Amino acid sequence: MATRAQGKKIKKVVKKDAKIHLRQAIKIDPDFLDARYELGSLLLSEGELKGAEEQFNKVVKLDNNHAEGYYKLALISAENRKNKKARDLFEKAVTIKFDDAKIQFDYGLFLKKLKKYEEAIEHFTKAIEANQNFSEAYFELAMLLKDPEDYDRAKKNYETAIDIRPDYGDANYYLGKLVMTGIQKDSDGTLLSQPETDYAVTCFEKVLKIDDTYSKAHLRLGMIYADRDEHDEANKHLRLTLKLNTRSSKALYHLGLVSKTLSKEKEAIKFLKRSLTHYSKSYLTHFHLGLLLKENQDIDKGITHLNKTVELNQEFDEAYYYLAKFFEEKEDHESAKEHYMKAIARNHKHRDAYYHLGLLMKKLNVMEEAKTYMEKAIETDQNFTKGYYHLGLILNDPSNYADARKCYLTAIDIEPSFLMAHYHLANLLSSGQRLKKDGTPVIRKELKLAKKHYIESLRLDPKFPKIH
């Protein structure tokens, strides 16, 4: 039996002999179209583009309806980056032979390379019409159906490619990737996320049965298991990804998040830093690294990475929010306020940004602003216990007696065990200081109710010193 090397040598000799015989045939009959086409095809397969082009030009001159000749010339022009010429030649080929699946498919690939996606979709569809068992055409068509409104169509095309060819690794992988996010539009155009993670896991596991070195499938499984808090499985697949691709910034990023969840902060920091060495423009990596560095007592480096986060993504409200908190901790109140405001400008329903900005304004004794921001926090979340409680503290003035009383009571209604709300409500009721409608100060103590809330405070914490 011939070895692989011997087999290659034999093929080379056969091709060489074939070329000699074809050239001899053409010498005898220069108009021998089939000989020229076969010689051109042999030269093209060996990368001799100039010689191949010469033969195919002769072919289409001899027969101006020779679709395969125009097709091969189109492939050569595309290889030479003569895109306009290639396109014209593809058009001639598909006009003459519109039901040739291979020509339609390769024209689709050419258009995809030019980013003419709608036209590529048209030709992949025509390839499928010509050959309904053309798995690669279904796959390439699915790959271009990226709009959420085409979700079902993309899914069906991936599944058809796999039905035809069950060992189609890429089709299984990209089907898994599609259903993992489940981003689609319903009939009225509303954007939905309906992930099918079990289905995705099945797809990725099939990929790994076909090829256990398919690193991206390990990565996706690691991401899914991390979301499910199955940290051992997540860790296993993410480390396998890294073993197969040491430069995988995504694997390093997700390993960092898993390590953080497991309270292995130092390990998490190492993974995130390594991730940035391979891809420095990941705003999420900078964000999580910034938070971790702050937790590990390096607030300045934390700020550096959060600043990089907002440089890379100027609309990321959470980064502005945490920057504000870090600046507030450093007692840079002006920068803190500025960044809380930036968070709110990007997310008008950012409850915690309103809340902490309200607390900051209270600390700075800017009480009207403090009141406004705390009210905004409550507006975004009407069950926000701490919001009602702190608004009650802000309204600690005889002119706002009724409103403060209402805030404390609301906080207690939502969270009956909120000790400090009971305590400050009791203080307010026992003081009884309020204003009449005409602005005259008056004291009307509510001692019975005050006593009730003091007692409740003691029940919640018998050692609470302020009441004793």
Residue ranges and their predicted role:
Residues 204, 459-468:
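Short, intrinsically disordered, charge-balanced linker/junction segments flanking boundaries
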Residues 68-79, 88, 102, 106-113:
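A generic tandem-repeat structural signature
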Residues 33-34, 67-68, 101-102, 135-136, ...:
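Helix-start (N-cap) detector for alpha-helical repeat units in TPR-like alpha-solenoids
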Residues 7-24, 45-58, 79-92, 112-126, ...:
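Structural signature of tandem alpha-helical TPR/SEL1-like repeats
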Residues 321, 352-362, 379, 384-397, ...:
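Eukaryotic tandem repeat interaction scaffolds
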